[in-house]
């Protein structure tokens, strides 16, 4: 019987097959690190008197706690400052490569690695961060791990794991105009639920996926974890190879040719069998937005806020009641009638150059609505920021009335100065809309960059077609 893409990558990295129910031992090609989940791992190495096994397969950056303004000034938050200085100290002591705040290659961990060509097809990639699934857009098996596992990888370059199940997510047909990768993944999560992918590697397939750019593919794989999955993957193709060619850490010369030859084998075999399969028709999709407090509570923008009675399952009904109360929404309210206070464009989900271009094209020649308190545009990496400035996108954002920031996780999460206040409502291109995610009492609607930009113009949740 044939193998799926995930099974092929797993088999290529199998050090030892587990027996009698024991986990396999898997080799890890690359581990990415940041300031939040690494301190205890370094301390564990220190206490055990160990050193990293392969320094050239470890790389760190500062992203979660970093300010996006006044980056040359002391961090005002003591806890954040401590985590950043601790990472810098640990990397110096153990010899781990670090791209700190202010470095030309600094950025969100899942944005800077692909841009440097560190992320490549067929690799196993881990990080103490759930959105490591982003790198699966290249045909890598990439997943988040806990802090104790971070220590284990530093010490051994391996992990003990039981094989993941596999699920095919087929997006058949062609996407309608105005529908983006973010709309696809939000629709998928709404369909299968936030636990629908639990224990699975999701492989995204179909013509609609194949037509996406690498930036768009990363958006989809990034949010696999919001469906409960361990990882998300897309088979590498000519789009993948074109993105990687010439990047600093991509293979060169004959090594490039050999790599591409191998990468072309990384496709699910025709006779492979998935453990589960889900199919959506691309032409049925439309711009999507969340209304509640988990990424699965979403609807098409043409719809209305649902009522608890719309849910047959008692648990979902109870969750809807709580979400409506927290979000301050009434059932039956048209999504387009929901006013927004703040717009956030950024994160490891939608802070790449393509996302910024889309937002800038919509904002060009407009001004933000008077009712909008602020619009934050935060590139996912320093390289993306520089590229956007070379293209003049920063001037469009500033003319519009937006704040153009330095790279970082920013308002995706309340771990840095970019936060919402209680009951402030945002439309955000990030990945999570949990209670308090963007600050205590914050209310978050997840959407695409196009929807966020249009909303900033009109003041209520909108699409570019509404302008």
Swiss-Prot record:
**Which residues participate in [4Fe-4S] cluster binding?**
348, 409, 412
Tell me the keywords, alphabetical order: 4Fe-4S, Amino-acid biosynthesis, Branched-chain amino acid biosynthesis, Iron, Iron-sulfur, Leucine biosynthesis, Lyase, Metal-binding
Task: Give cofactor(s), names only.
Answer: [4Fe-4S] cluster
**Which GO molecular-function terms appear in the entry?**
3-isopropylmalate dehydratase activity; 4 iron, 4 sulfur cluster binding; metal ion binding
Swiss-Prot/TrEMBL catalytic activity: (2R,3S)-3-isopropylmalate = (2S)-2-isopropylmalate
PANTHER family xrefs: 3-ISOPROPYLMALATE DEHYDRATASE, HOMOACONITASE, MITOCHONDRIAL-RELATED
Function, in words: Catalyzes the isomerization between 2-isopropylmalate and 3-isopropylmalate, via the formation of 2-isopropylmaleate.
Name of the protein in its database record: 3-isopropylmalate dehydratase large subunit
Q: Corresponding gene?
A: leuC
